Curated annotation (Swiss-Prot):
Domain of life: Eukaryota
N6-methyllysine: residues bearing it: K311
Stretch list, region Disordered: 323-384
Phosphoserine modified-residue sites: S214
Name assigned to this protein: WD repeat-containing protein 74
Spans annotated as Required for nucleolar and nuclear location: 320-384
Subcellular localization(s) per the UniProt record: Nucleus, Nucleolus; Nucleus
UniProt keyword list: Methylation, Nucleus, Phosphoprotein, Repeat, WD repeat
Keyword Nucleus recorded: yes
Main location: nucleus
Length: 384
């Protein structure tokens, strides 16, 4: 593993093959990190979050229901704990006041004592937030407050230090013009800075803003984009707009104050799985099923800044918030130990290229054969 330069990685990406990848954009270099040295699809990375000590530690949520603690400074896995309860994969991870917060597909949200990492330990708190959860998101200002949303599971806000009932429960929009119920499918949510408002994106290509302070529990603003389900969302550095991505790789910036489209970003070729903006720079990191990590500039001029192919399907990402991207010391690169699955992929492509070369005829030999055939023909003969 490349551990000496791990602290200078700009983006951390979780893959479907269970690999945590650290990407240095200045060097166009990606390092692979696995606790056992071999990738396993049973340990696919579904959720990532920073530890409470800044950006020195990463919490890695895997499909086998283990949460691994990764030292981002040294590039090593420190420990892990098993978090049972409910069914499905992690839909959100968070840390708050010495506790670990997990939430899974089936709607079981649990709070664990972080100091006790034994598998047999019981959770400090368990909440049933409803089935079909798509996302659990922590309030960055009040770390003990989280929001959950999902399919046929309306947006809810929970105070983990209060009662076991949500402090806010969103209400579905009114029936459509045929007086039919509108289905619920909230894919992602974000807390808006400087207020109690929340914004969600839906599987029916809508962006909605909710205000828990308002007397109504329905959205106070709604906008639509495209025709395909929205799968991921992130706030821009100014906090006045969001960037959403859909299942066809389309990215768009929407002003949630007026509900209008500000612009689009191009380049993706598959469903978007992860989006995150830099807190101070006009940069957006995106990843998805096309196995490519992209960094876009979201302010004039808009465009693609970096593009790194990472070989595996990408599920989630973390973008470093530091500002000194260009001022890093140039450390010697260590040889990267590529897991066996990536090595097999390279060998497969190499064999395909070799087979293609064997099938192509030699141009010189073909021309020589044609000339010999012409010389052997008798005078006055005509070609068929």
């Amino acid at each position: 593993m490349a551990t000496a330069s791990a602290r200078w990685n700009h983006v951390w990406v979780g893959t479907e093959t269970g690999i945590l990848k650290g990407v240095n954009l200045q060097r166009k270099h990606a390092a692979n990190f696995t606790p056992s040295g071999q990738p396993r699809r049973e340990e696919a990375v579904n959720a990532l979050c920073w530890g409470t000590g800044g950006e020195t530690q990463i919490l890695v949520g895997c499909a086998d229901r283990t949460v691994r603690y990764f030292n981002a400074e040294e590039g090593t896995f420190l420990s892990q704990r098993y978090c049972p309860g409910g069914e499905g994969t992690f839909r959100g991870l968070a840390q708050a006041d010495g506790t670990l917060i997990t939430c899974v597909d089936s709607g079981i949200l649990r709070v664990w004592c972080e100091n006790d990492k034994e598998a047999s330990s019981d959770p400090l708190l368990e909440l049933k937030v409803g089935p079909g959860v798509c996302r659990m998101r922590q309030d960055p200002t009040h770390t003990h407050v989280v929001a959950t949303c999902g399919k046929e599971n309306a947006l809810k806000v929970w105070d983990l230090q209060g009662s076991e009932e949500p402090v806010f429960r969103a209400k579905n929009v009114r029936n459509d013009w045929l007086d039919l119920r509108v289905p619920i499918w909230d894919q992602d949510t974000q807390f808006l800075p400087g207020s109690q408002k929340l914004v969600t994106c839906t599987g029916y290509h809508q962006v909605r803003v909710y205000d828990p302070v308002s007397p109504q529990r329905r959205p106070v603003l709604e906008a639509t984009y495209g025709e395909y389900p929205l799968t991921a969302m992130t706030l821009t550095p100014e906090g006045n707009s969001v960037i959403v991505g859909n299942t066809h790789g389309q990215l768009a910036e929407i002003d949630f104050r007026q509900g209008r489209l500000l612009g689009c970003l191009k380049g993706l070729a598959g469903s978007v799985r992860g989006l995150q903006c830099h807190p101070s720079k006009p940069l957006l990191a995106s990843c998805g099923l096309d196995r490519v990590l992209r960094i876009h500039r979201i302010r004039n001029p808009r465009g693609l800044e970096h593009k790194v192919y990472l070989k595996s399907q990408l599920n989630c990402l973390l973008l470093s918030g530091r500002d000194n991207w260009e001022d890093e010391p140039q450390e010697p690169q260590e040889p990267n130990q590529v897991p066996s699955e990536d090595t097999e992929t390279d060998e497969l492509w190499a064999s395909l290229e070799a087979a293609a070369k064997r099938k192509l005829p030699d141009l010189d030999q073909t021309q020589g054969a044609l000339q010999r055939r012409k010389k052997k023909k008798r005078p006055g003969s005509t070609s068929p």
